[in-house]
Amino acid sequence: MNPVVHFEMPAEDKNRMADFYTKAFGWKTQMLGPDMNEYVLVTTTEPDENGRPRNPGAINGGFYKKSADMPAQYPSVVIGVGDIKEAMKKDMEAGGKVLGEPMEIPGYGLYVSFFDTEGNRVSMMQPR
């Protein structure tokens, strides 16, 4: 079984969104630079020495800037997989639609998004 390992939410203004979740829920945010497409890492629970959530069942996530050329910009989850190419194949066989090829997220692993059979944008990641 492949677990949910991350969430993502789009933002018109990533600074405003980071400020909101920090004030409302105590989340910690880390602004990444242009080499990571200005992504914002979000920590919702105390991490262990490897940066993974210490609390069972808890996940961390990120915010990304909304873009006119990106489909289905809604809150979504990221599913951890052992072999991203095999998971992409199974996704398509089950009726999903993979959105492009996996991209390397430096320090984390391979990442690709897909639409499920109901039109939800979901992503998968093969950790390093």
Predicted features along the sequence, with ranges:
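N-terminal beta-strand motif that seeds the catalytic metal site of vicinal oxygen chelate
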Residues: M1-F20, Y74-V77, V81, P127-R128
